[in-house]
From Swiss-Prot:
Belongs to the universal ribosomal protein uL6 family. This protein binds to the 23S rRNA, and is important in its secondary structure. It is located near the subunit interface in the base of the L7/L12 stalk, and near the tRNA binding site of the peptidyltransferase center. One of its GO terms (molecular function) is rRNA binding. The lineage of its organism: Bacteria, Pseudomonadati, Thermodesulfobacteriota, Syntrophia, Syntrophales. PROSITE patterns: RIBOSOMAL_L6_1. This is Large ribosomal subunit protein uL6. Pfam families: Ribosomal_L6. The keyword DNA damage does not apply. It comes from Syntrophus aciditrophicus (strain SB).
Length: 179
């Protein structure tokens, strides 16, 4: 049996979870999220916890068992506390500015890069080199952070570029001058 899938999910007091057909809707103080549940698993709910069960022990059913449990857990955490990703910009003259729902990046290209931040993601700029993305959907927050990082990945020689706040950039030694 899936070790992750068989654990019950505790529902915080301010979060409600309801099932409509094959969709699960989780609502809390920060908003609400909905996801489609595959027919391979069954979700059993009561007032304080959610339990995910599977119909058979086939390989596919076992894989969905843990996946669905984790997706529901991420939805509950998102609507109760939310998710946050921090990015750092490293480089002389590199900076970020917020212009409404757009992020303007000045990162060494001939013109500034404008990135449109999707709905459901909150953008906060601390100093000019720290970007904080937050939202209730873990997948969406991570995807937006990865797209922003992809604009200028940190390079290994000087470490310039956009990196996650906790990311360690492996540095390489540059060319040595001939003797």
């Amino acid at each position: 049996m899936s070790r992750i899938g068989k654990k019950p999910i505790e529902l915080p007091a301010n979060v409600t979870c309801e099932r409509t057909g094959n969709a699960i809707k989780v609502a809390g103080p920060r908003g609400e999220l909905t996801t489609i549940i595959p027919e391979k698993v069954e979700v059993v709910m009561d007032q304080t916890k959610v339990l995910v069960k599977r119909h058979s022990d086939s390989r596919e059913d076992r894989s969905y068992h843990g996946l669905v449990r984790t997706l529901i857990q991420n939805m509950i955490t998102g609507v109760s506390t939310g998710y946050e990703k921090s990015l750092e910009i490293v480089g002389v003259g590199f900076k970020a500015e917020a212009e409404g729902r757009n992020l303007k990046l000045t990162i060494g290209y001939s013109s500034p890069i404008i990135y449109a931040v999707p709905e459901g993601i909150d953008l906060k700029i601390e100093k000019a080199t720290n970007i904080i993305l937050s939202g209730i959907d873990k997948e969406k927050v991570g995807k937006v952070a990865a797209e922003i990082r992809r604009i200028k990945k940190p390079e290994p020689y000087k470490g310039k570029g956009i990196k996650y706040a906790n990311e360690q950039v492996r540095r390489k030694v540059g060319k040595s001058v001939g003797a």
